[in-house]
Amino acid sequence: MSTDFVLLPEPQQSIRLDGDFEVAAGGSISVGARPSASLHRAARKLQEALSMVGQRWQLTPAGAETDADVRASIAINPYHVPRAQGYRITIEPDFLGIVAADDAGAFYAAATMRQIAEQFQGTGRLPCLRINDWPDFLTRGVMHDISKDKIPTLETIFGLVDMLAGLKVNQFQLHSENAFAYRDHKIVWADGTPVTGDDILALDEFCRERHVDLVANQNSFGHFERWFEHDEYKPLAESPEG
């Protein structure tokens, strides 16, 4: 099988090992002791990634008896992976192991496995390798301006956040001038399709599940044209006549 694949961003260390790892029927994935909800989500993402390559494996608690052959594991151990948000992936012919520094690291490991799986989809096998990865910058953000022309739907924003999280972006700034439905300032957004408070709450939960901090970014007086065009707000302008 071809062993060429691309990872974005590139891991700090990536070494190709001899052999292949078969994702055959009857396997299972061990999930670390006392797992958080976040680790469970990372384990499910790993499960989905392996399913793209071969068979779907069940998730089992670490140390639990199971009829399935434990062929993979995902766990958190900051002693083995000391750098925040870091992770280690080891794929050998008979086992796939993931160890992460924290919940975020486990999520990023699963995201890396997803990228690998997409490039070996349907082959039934993965190349053996060892990856050690951690961020150079603990905060990695993207600002998205939703005030220019069409305001995106919540589903579109969800899709963007999901893609960015898969690329290990962990801060998402939603930049707005008149795109938020302020309760006491309806005249500013009444003719549009603004993002509502309920939308923001749903987006915040969606972001948190992907280890992304949602940051509000509201234009202020220097970029308030769509506010100052209304008589109620013109007194706030330094040059009300433009």
Tell where the protein language model's regions lie, with residue ranges.
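Contiguous, structured surface segment used for ligand recognition
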Residues: 1-140
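Substrate-binding cleft of carbohydrate-active enzyme catalytic domains
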Residues: 137-242
